[in-house]
Amino acid sequence: MIVISNTNIIYSCFYKPEGVIATILKNRKNKLQFIAPSYLLDEIEEHLPQIMKKNQLTKRQAKTLLKEFTKNITFYDLEDIKRENRDKAVKIVKEIDPDDYLFIALHLEKGHKIWTCDFELINGLKRKGTISVLLQEN
């Protein structure tokens, strides 16, 4: 099974580096395959100072953990996703969380479920009834 990892899945790994989510992501023998838009890395970088502060990590430690958590994820650049899917995704999430449009666009492009623990996104997509989501409790 292939799943699209949402950014908050990676965030949760910093707070529980030995937790279920981090263990699943780090397992190379996993039957799950992970994909994500490369925007996920940009979003993590943007919030890295807060992550470092809350978890008492140096920049080097945070970067090492990020590499470990994302080593089994295949990333897709913006250009890898058709414009029509990006445009449709923008419309779907405009009232939920516009920052999540690339995850939705990748879902529209590839057809895989989105793995997330973002309840705002989950509930918003459920109301629209258009996107398959895998809920992950922290």
Sequence positions of predicted segments:
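Short, well-structured N-terminal submotif of metal-dependent ribonuclease cores
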Residues: 1-36
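A generic structural signal for short hydrophobic patches within well-formed alpha-helices
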Residues: 10, 41, 121-122
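Residue-level signal for well-ordered alpha-helical positions
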Residues: 16-17, 47, 127-128
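Short amphipathic alpha-helical segments and helix-helix/interface helices
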Residues: 21-25, 63-66, 103-104, 122
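PIN-domain endoribonuclease scaffold, especially VapC-family toxins
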Residues: 27-31, 35-87
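Acidic, PIN/NYN-like endoribonuclease modules and their adjacent C-terminal/linker elements
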Residues: 36, 104, 108-138
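Active-site neighborhoods of divalent-metal-dependent phosphate/nucleic-acid chemistry enzymes
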Residues: 74-119
